[in-house]
């Protein structure tokens, strides 16, 4: 009688998403005990090791550079104890961690609104970047920006309720694959009023005025 070929029943990643150039642990579960197995993530080979349960194999791999939202896992050349080889499986993939950047901008003076912009990778058009501005008294202003087709975003934040001084802006978000970008932040100096500049001629004029003495 022909024996059933082994099959891959599950594949998991730890962490569930990872950045390019960082290591991820992969756990493969099969329906039968195996004597051999191999796998690749985005073309990079995993060094698989059989666990105490020969149905479970694990390995680490560095996430390769890719422009895609995910990187594909290919499991192949896996043999059961009778030498039967299972079919190549490419049904699993891991999201690559998206990224957010905040652009550079100047200190804000004499204005209560600041325009903040930035870029993203692995966010699709219409997805949302969450922002918050925090002053030195921990007062918070929240905002959100919509990612455009080219991956950029822009938002105007109203700072009128915040205290003058150093403001820290934070940006974060998750894409459609529930992969969360690392939060980024930047700081700037905020002054809601414009400094009054006294003309030099007024200084000369006032100095020439006779001082009034109390009677």
Describe every region a protein language model picked out.
Residues 187-190:
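Beta-strand-rich recognition domains
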């Amino acid at each position: 009688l022909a024996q059933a070929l082994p099959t891959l029943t599950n594949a998991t990643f730890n962490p569930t998403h990872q950045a390019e150039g960082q290591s991820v642990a992969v756990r493969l579960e099969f329906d039968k005990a195996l004597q051999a197995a191999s796998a690749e993530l985005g073309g990079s080979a995993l060094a698989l090791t059989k666990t105490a349960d020969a149905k479970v194999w694990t390995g680490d791999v560095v996430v390769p550079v890719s422009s895609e939202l995910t990187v594909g896992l290919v499991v192949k050349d896996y043999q059961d104890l009778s030498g039967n080889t299972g079919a190549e499986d490419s049904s699993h993939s891991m999201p690559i961690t998206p990224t957010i950047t905040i652009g550079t901008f100047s200190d804000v003076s004499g204005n209560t609104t600041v325009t903040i912009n930035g870029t993203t990778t692995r966010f699709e058009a219409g997805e949302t970047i969450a922002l918050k501005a925090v002053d030195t008294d921990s007062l918070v202003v929240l905002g959100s920006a919509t990612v455009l087709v080219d991956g950029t975003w822009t938002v105007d934040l109203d700072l009128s309720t915040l205290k003058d001084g150093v403001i820290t802006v934070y940006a974060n978000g998750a894409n459609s694959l529930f992969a969360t970008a690392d939060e980024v932040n930047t700081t700037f100096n905020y002054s809601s009023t414009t400094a009054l500049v006294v003309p030099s001629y007024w200084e000369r004029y006032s100095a020439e005025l006779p001082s009034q003495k109390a009677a």
